[in-house]
Amino acid sequence: MKIAKKFMALALAAVLSVGCAFGVSADGSRTKDITVTKTNELSEIYEIVQKIEDTEGFKELKETVPAVADAFKKVSEGKMDLKGFTDVLKTLAEEATDETVKAAIEEVIEKLDGKDFVTGFVQFRVKDHERAEKNADGKYEVEISVPSITDEMENIQLLCYNKETEEWTVIDPINIDKENKTIKVALDDLCYFTIIADAKTDAAEDTTEAAETTTEETTTAE
């Protein structure tokens, strides 16, 4: 009985630990549930491609920069955390021959410090170029629905990759509506992106400590 209760406590700890991770499902994968808000006509002009592995751009990415394609896949499957992804970026920076590209990647690495993934990687695509409008910066402004957003999330941002320019950026949303779980952003056509936010380090530590205490109390009670 003592051993059985101890394992029950450990199982509870495992469940709670998974709950501390942003957007992680029961099988360990990260959610890609991101869509263009359907309350306006923008959903007829733009779309979010969730199955990026099926796109021609991703197939090309696997040939030109396989490390990035593999990282996108692993992040979405929940097999790579942000630290692991940052290591991939560090390698890209070391191998970069263009100093501008190298500096941009290093800047992104700095901005990712203390962050965590909220979603897996998806792709933004313009469906109707005739109706689509660019802003002053040459980007498309769109409101997206992100159900995995919570009130507790702080400093929500997007990590973006433009395959055509090989540019990595961390961008701030134009607006965030946590109540309706929507984000307004400005994106490049065909860019890949993931939602990130401040990591819940304290929450994870508290959960671990609570689980350990539960295990100890269960054992002592026996």
Q: Could you describe each region identified by the protein language model?
A:
Residues A132-I196, K200:
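Proteolytic-maturation and junctional protease-sensitive modules
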Residues K2-K6, L10, G19-T119, A132-T150, ...:
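Feature for mature exported/ectodomain regions
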Residues A13:
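Active/ligand-binding-proximal structured segments within catalytic/core domains
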Residues K2, L10, D128-E130, I171, ...:
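Residue-level detector of functional hotspots within protein domains
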